[in-house]
């Protein structure tokens, strides 16, 4: 069963996205990038994020969408801002695509590296290795989005 999966790593400065094709345990990276969010008012930043997501959905169709849940942060303002971005993303995905899967950062790290407390660099190393890529993927927002898509692909194989 050949599935096209969109993985998203939401952020308030950059939102990483990755498109993989998953088929019988083999995953192929189709595209990965960033939705860049310029410093501005929160309303305009959320608008930029949603417009970037619109563009991705206009250029591709997906069987599955997966998004990383927000991480715990010590700064309440940061948590609130990330929650607003994530809420806007969730609504946009529901409007365009419908249901989507959610994974915590710990679930993603565990699925990709085998360790829930892995560093971002360890995740990046394993993403590169799992996809058989020769070049490093930068920035880490993109690597995280790929990891989300890979986590969802693995989760689907377990459920099928």
Swiss-Prot record:
The answer on whether this UniProt entry bears the keyword Ribosomal protein reads no
Gene Ontology terms for molecular function: crossover junction DNA endonuclease activity; DNA binding; magnesium ion binding
Which CDD domains is this protein grouped with?
RuvC
Q: Where does Mg(2+) 2 bind?
A: 68
GO biological process per UniProt: DNA recombination; DNA repair
Recorded hits in Gene3D superfamilies, A to Z, give: Ribonuclease H-like superfamily/Ribonuclease H
Keywords, ordered alphabetically: Cytoplasm, DNA damage, DNA recombination, DNA repair, DNA-binding, Endonuclease, Hydrolase, Magnesium, Metal-binding, Nuclease
GO cellular component labels: cytoplasm; Holliday junction resolvase complex
Q: List required co-factors.
A: Mg(2+)
Q: Which domain of life is it from?
A: Bacteria
Residues in a coiled coil are: none
Protein task: The RuvA-RuvB-RuvC complex processes Holliday junction (HJ) DNA during genetic recombination and DNA repair. Endonuclease that resolves HJ intermediates. Cleaves cruciform DNA by making single-stranded nicks across the HJ at symmetrical positions within the homologous arms, yielding a 5'-phosphate and a 3'-hydroxyl group; requires a central core of homology in the junction. The consensus cleavage sequence is 5'-(A/T)TT(C/G)-3'. Cleavage occurs on the 3'-side of the TT dinucleotide at the point of strand exchange.
Oligomeric state and interaction partners are given as: Homodimer which binds Holliday junction (HJ) DNA. The HJ becomes 2-fold symmetrical on binding to RuvC with unstacked arms; it has a different conformation from HJ DNA in complex with RuvA. In the full resolvosome a probable DNA-RuvA(4)-RuvB(12)-RuvC(2) complex forms which resolves the HJ.
Under the heading PANTHER family, the entry gives: CROSSOVER JUNCTION ENDODEOXYRIBONUCLEASE RUVC
**What is the similarity comment for this entry?**
Belongs to the RuvC family.
Q: What is this protein called?
A: Crossover junction endodeoxyribonuclease RuvC
Q: Which organism is it from?
A: Campylobacter jejuni subsp. jejuni serotype O:2 (strain ATCC 700819 / NCTC 11168)
């Amino acid at each position: 069963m050949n599935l096209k999966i969109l993985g998203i790593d939401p952020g308030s400065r950059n939102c990483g996205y990755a498109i993989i094709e998953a088929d019988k345990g083999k995953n192929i990276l189709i595209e990965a990038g960033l939705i860049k969010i310029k410093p501005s008012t929160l309303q305009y930043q959320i608008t930029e994020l949603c417009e970037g997501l619109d563009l991705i959905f206009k250029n591709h169709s997906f069987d599955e969408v997966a998004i990383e849940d927000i991480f715990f942060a010590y700064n309440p303002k940061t948590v609130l801002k990330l929650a607003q971005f994530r809420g806007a993303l969730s609504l946009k995905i529901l409007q365009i695509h419908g249901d989507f899967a959610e994974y915590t950062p710990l679930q993603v790290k565990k699925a990709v590296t085998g360790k829930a407390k892995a560093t971002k660099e360890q995740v990046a190393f394993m993403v590169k290795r799992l996809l058989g890529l020769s070049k490093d993927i930068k920035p880490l927002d993109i690597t995280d989005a790929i990891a989300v898509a890979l986590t969802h692909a693995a989760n689907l194989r377990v459920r099928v």
